Amino acid sequence: MISGLLKKIFGSRNDRLIRQYSQTVRAINALEPEISALSDEALQAKTADFKQRVANGESLDSILPEAFAVVREAGKRVHGMRHFDVQLIGGMVLHNGKISEMRTGEGKTLVATLPAYLNALTGKGVHVITVNDYLASRDADWMGRIYGFLGLTTGCNLSRMGHEAKQAAYASDITYGTNNEFGFDYLRDNMVYSTGERVQRGLSFAIVDEVDSILIDEARTPLIISGQAEDHTDLYLKLNQVAPMLAEQEGEGDNVIKPGDYTLDLKARQVLLTEQGHENAEQILTRMGLLAEGTSLYDPGNILLVHHLYAALRAHSLYHKDQHYVVQNNEVVIVDEFTGRLMAGRRWSDGLHQAVEAKESVRIQAENQTLASITFQNYFRMYGKLAGMTGTADTEAFEFHSIYGLETVVVPTNRAMVRKDENDKVYRTAKEKWDAVIADIRGCVERGQPVLVGTTSIEINEFLSGELNRVDLSHQVLNAKQHEHEAEIVAQAGRPGVITIATNMAGRGTDIVLGGSIERQLAAVRDDETLTPEQKEARTAALREEWKPVHEQVLANGGLHIIGTERHESRRIDNQLRGRAGRQGDPGSSRFYLSLEDPLMKIFAGERLNAIMVRLKMPEGEAIEHAMVTRSLESAQRKVEQRNFDIRKQLLEYDDVANDQRKVIYQQRNELLEADDISETIRAMRQGVLHDSFRVHVPVDSVEEQWDIAALEQALASEFQLRLPIGEWLKAEPNLDDETILKRLLAAAEEQYAVKTAQVDPVAWHQFERNVMLQSLDTHWREHLAALDHLRQGIHLRGYAQKNPKQEYKREAFELFETLLDTVRNDVSKLLMTVQVRTEAQLEEAEVPPELENVQYQHAAFDEALGVATAPEAAQAAAPAGPKIGRNDPCPCGSGKKYKHCHGKLS
């Protein structure tokens, strides 16, 4: 009550921030007459002036009013677009490293030019991140004209670009690209074998468009670069026959209606075998010769078999054609559940994709091994400054703040929003719902009102399209199968009486203009070199005059009407669909039609509402329409959002362990790449490994009778090619102590190594040492990633032993990391001691880094394992970022030791 009273008196924090920004807006507006009076040359000269002032120590904040006024003027001169006052506020929010919530149609693309220009003055580069390649190239071209006019360079980072083109894109002042591509470039930059192969130049400032989609929806999905692993094709085919032989159990616990072999967890997308299922599966697998007689499904040797059996069951019971994937050109192509797009080249991991391929009888492609991985949370937190824009962030403000430290500021609209959001209509059956949807669509067509129908999957999209064809209602379909034409379809979706059916509208990036867009015709006139400026002006005016009455007709008919055919798991995605209507103060309306057979209703509200409908004896075709129903649905969505937040938070807690280790490995890689000579590091490693090997056979503080000299001589000869007569030394010198023997051993090793290196050019040998070290580090890091993955999959079982799974994971991951570093030290030392090189040609041959087969770039979901499109073969990748770990800083692994005494020892 008191906080509410204080808010009324002083306003909320959001109100106070907007008031502060509004004062700066007044300062920018005061500069407008002066800036407008400048010639083009004088306006362009401002950029060099600003850069000099920044170089002299002036802060960006003090330059901001004048810089924003310059960008606003450039927008007017280049595109005839003047930034509104609220867009200036949005730009300030972004510059301050916050999230700017701006409604659909408020011009977020133009807003980004303000902070991008200002921050590019530092020369460190600005990354503007969008959700797809089409928007990245469109915005880079469109806004790049403003930056180019002001003397800044613009780059576009696309997935099909070559290495040199990527380097040029990153060298630009402002670089546009997709979140996936920036993340993959970072990972690839940490797999290179020379500094010249890197493309990124550090992570300074990022502006993320559709920030909720990228930092929330896709944050459950790590970026994974993988290469081909062992082939298990026969196993997939055999287990594909087993899955249909096992039956689903209906009900759980005391409420089992029909016993079965497995239960489904629809929320977690998991399958669990019942006791009956274990027995049946073992019998079937034994009959098929996959399981040895008398062995259990859970014997250590059968771990792979269990893993693939579960994958086959998930493929058959949880992943459905035309909903989760489509079959195209004899391949299984995943459908992105957030956007409804086809994700060609992406693959589910953990054998699931191969199980689906076996189910659909298409060619089974080999499984992959993880080469590098990072989550979006950990990638974006490496930027020195991070900001984002979206139309719907307020519902997730807590998550943005708790995970990314980002505050959300709701920016007021330029014009008041007048869209009418009507209560949901809930029907008993899907048939009644679809009848009502078609009746509403028909009413819109008769009124001449454009209508956009949102669906949650391609399957429903195509079902509704078929129903509309049946009743002779012409329409256009926008889903993953037509994404090449999507911008044009969306642009024309505002014409009178046009029906557009679309899967998830998140990230479409194109405004629906009432009356239809004439941007393409205007662009054709602008680019027509046969026309004089006067003719261009006349044609442009004529096009606008033709469009005006159509626009006014749609306004009079009520603007765009939005129909939702199902509630999404997230309120935010429902709001994104609604937000397509009512842009820039236009009229519009929205309504959701639901049935008790919808997935979300089944899980959360179906039984209760069904009981109410039966009790009220509601006739067929009658709907419940009440604010209470809408509220209860939003409450159900909040529960799902909370669960998804918990999943993302848990993923982050586990990935933070891997991230700390990743930082150590990547820092050591970069130190290796940048060093001309690592011979001292190699020498220290060699002496450490020899010392450890010696102490295995000659323990500290032991007597001679406990020494195993014969085994020591054999180990030195076989592992290090070091043949020393230690037994004879002891016979000749009975008083020889262990420390003296160790010193002689180390001296002999150094002498032998020096003889070997003297045979070749020192520069070539140093390069060889570095490449051996890099290859060993990379190989064992990949194996370590797989080990961490397996550890994480089974760690929850520690809870049954009254242990904290997260603490156990941290402890065991640390032990695995210690083993990784020891293995690298051993491998490198032994290889360099045993390798026989006589010519520099042999060295050069050995230096060639191993070619990785079938490299794929996956964006695999944490629980649903979504994979990512293959990036260009020629494309290399990204540079290390984040603060460097000092030698005396605490080691990020959490041991409590200094970095130089812990994981910095390798360096």
From Swiss-Prot:
Superkingdom classification of source: Bacteria
Binding site for Zn(2+): C891, C893, C902, H903
Reactions catalysed according to its record: ATP + H2O + cellular proteinSide 1 = ADP + phosphate + cellular proteinSide 2
Molecular-function annotations in GO: ATP binding; metal ion binding; protein-exporting ATPase activity
PROSITE patterns referenced in this protein's UniProt entry, alphabetically: SECA, SECA_MOTOR_DEAD
GO biological process, alphabetically ordered: intracellular protein transmembrane transport; protein import; protein targeting; protein transport by the Sec complex
Enzyme Commission code(s) on record: 7.4.2.8
Co-factor binding details: May bind 1 zinc ion per subunit.
Main location class: membrane
Cofactor(s) listed: Zn(2+)
Lipid bilayer topology: Peripheral membrane protein
Subcellular location: Cell inner membrane; Cytoplasm
Enzyme class: translocase
UniProt cross-references to InterPro entries, sorted A to Z: Helicase_ATP-bd, Helicase_C-like, P-loop_NTPase, SEC_C_motif, SecA, SecA_CS, SecA_DEAD, SecA_motor_DEAD
Keyword field: ATP-binding, Cell inner membrane, Cell membrane, Cytoplasm, Membrane, Metal-binding, Nucleotide-binding, Protein transport, Translocase, Translocation, Transport, Zinc
UniProt KW Nucleotide-binding keyword: yes
Record-listed ATP binding positions: Q87, G105, E106, G107, K108, T109, D511
Complexes and interactors: Monomer and homodimer. Part of the essential Sec protein translocation apparatus which comprises SecA, SecYEG and auxiliary proteins SecDF-YajC and YidC.
Similarity-based family: Belongs to the SecA family.
Main function: Part of the Sec protein translocase complex. Interacts with the SecYEG preprotein conducting channel. Has a central role in coupling the hydrolysis of ATP to the transfer of proteins into and across the cell membrane, serving both as a receptor for the preprotein-SecB complex and as an ATP-driven molecular motor driving the stepwise translocation of polypeptide chains across the membrane.
Classification via PANTHER family: CHLOROPLAST PROTEIN-TRANSPORTING ATPASE (PTHR30612:SF0), SECA INNER MEMBRANE COMPONENT OF SEC PROTEIN SECRETION SYSTEM (PTHR30612)
Name by which UniProt lists this protein: Protein translocase subunit SecA
Organism: Aromatoleum aromaticum (strain DSM 19018 / LMG 30748 / EbN1) (Azoarcus sp. (strain EbN1))
Lineage, uppermost ranks: Bacteria, Pseudomonadati, Pseudomonadota, Betaproteobacteria, Rhodocyclales
